[in-house]
Amino acid sequence: MKISELRDKSLEELTQLLDEKQLDAFRIRMAKATGQLGNTHEVRVNRRAIAQLQTLINEKQRGDS
């Protein structure tokens, strides 16, 4: 999802997306550890998405837009 699309979402939606991404990150790490992960690029993409969501959540909590 693009950052501009994420900025339009509410704080509750962002926290829900963050929870989903963190669960995905856990699944990806487990797949990598067991050797079942074919595309290792997913680790980086997922970690970046989590960072973007955390940044947007912090901005909304502080009142910045």
From Swiss-Prot:
Signal peptide residue numbers: none
A GO cellular-component term linked to this record: ribosome
Classification via Pfam families: Ribosomal_L29
Family matches, as InterPro entries: Ribosomal_uL29 (IPR001854), Ribosomal_uL29_sf (IPR036049)
SUPFAM superfamilies in UniProt: Ribosomal protein L29 (L29p) (SSF46561)
Entry superkingdom: Bacteria
Keywords: Ribonucleoprotein, Ribosomal protein
HAMAP family, per database record: Ribosomal_uL29
NCBIfam families per the UniProt record, alphabetical: L29
UniProt-recorded name of the protein: Large ribosomal subunit protein uL29
